[in-house]
Design a protein with these regions (language model features):
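Residues on a specific face of well-ordered alpha-helices
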Residues: 14, 18, 22, 26, ...
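Conserved phosphate-donor
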Residues: 91
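Gly/Ser/Thr-enriched, mixed-charge loops and adjacent short helices
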Residues: 1-88, 103-104
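Phosphate-binding and adjacent anionic-ligand microenvironments
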Residues: 94-97, 104-107, 111, 117, ...
Length: 287
């Protein structure tokens, strides 16, 4: 799988993605017909310099781990971690796209809640936030509670409808890059002079559960669905949303017959139940 990203690390338009895919499927050309070769190793230094601008000088009581030893060495070197006590452990996945936090008091805190913590800091500071289109709906509720807006950008836009969200996201690396999320989180802890459990306790209680499933019919088929005990309909360009008393479930088409279910509720068991019920509902074809 090849992922294509454009300016500021954001996903490219559907048209450009198709053009790049077509290019990669062409036959190999002899060396004389190729253009100039460029040494891209300097890109790593540019990334490092940008990350260094976002981290505090020396992070204490924090261990940052990754299943990729290169990521682990890189981020620890940039953030100059100084403690072996590991009051807070941050773990980055192999692709650098997700982050979790762990303390004895909080247990494991998933990436979406760390994004919410960073977003809450921005909102408290009087700034809007921008997140990927399939981010949980509670980020919109959180933004509204501060009188601000949570903009969303599409994964493969066909027009400029998400330009405002993309311009904002270009300055908020923490919303999509786990290394920058780790840096942002430690900066917030240092600025507020708080422990992670204290900071985490400020977040409104909410559990988010996400899974993917297969849909044999086109996504537009969901437009015809109706429910008796809940509301169901389109959520702008982001997919569909199913709302009932226990919580919300967002349904986002991913292409190739797959879709993502993201449920939010006040406890884990209910969120899992909402996902399972939504999957059964759309698979049944009931109207």
């Amino acid at each position: 799988t090849v992922s294509i990203f454009g300016e500021n690390g954001l996903s490219v338009s559907a048209a450009l993605g198709r053009k790049a895919a077509d290019f990669m499927e062409t036959d190999l050309s002899p060396a004389p017909s190729c253009g100039r070769l460029f040494d891209m190793s300097a890109m790593g230094m540019l990334y490092r310099d940008e990350l260094m601008r976002h981290v505090p000088y020396g992070v204490s009581d924090c261990a940052i781990l990754s299943s990729d030893p290169m990521i682990s060495a890189f981020i620890n070197d940039c953030m100059r971690t100084t403690s072996n006590e590991r009051a807070l452990t941050l773990r980055i996945n192999r692709r650098g796209t997700s982050l979790s936090a762990y303390t004895e008091k909080t247990g494991v805190v998933p990436f979406v809640k760390l994004i919410a913590i960073c977003g809450m800091y921005e909102l408290e500071s009087g700034r809007d936030i921008s997140v990927p289109y399939d981010s949980p709906a509670f980020l919109d509720d959180l933004a509204r509670s501060y009188g601000r807006t949570a903009y969303r950008y599409l994964s493969a836009p066909s027009d400029g409808s998400d330009n405002v969200a993309r311009r904002l996201a270009a300055r908020q690396f923490w919303s999509r890059d786990a290394l920058f999320t780790a840096a942002k989180l430690t900066c917030i802890l240092e600025e507020k002079n708080m422990t992670f459990p204290e900071l985490y306790s400020l977040l409104p209680p909410l559990f988010v559960y996400s899974t993917t499933a297969q849909l044999e019919l086109p996504p537009d088929y969901l437009d015809e669905f109706e429910g008796e005990n809940f509301s169901f309909g389109r959520d702008g360009a982001n997919g569909f949303v199913l709302v009932e008393k226990r919580g919300k479930t967002h349904i986002s088409p991913l292409g190739n017959g797959r879709f993502r279910l993201t449920a939010q509720s006040f406890d884990e068991e209910t969120a899992r139940e909402l996902c399972a019920e939504a999957q059964a509902f759309i698979s049944s074809g009931a109207k």
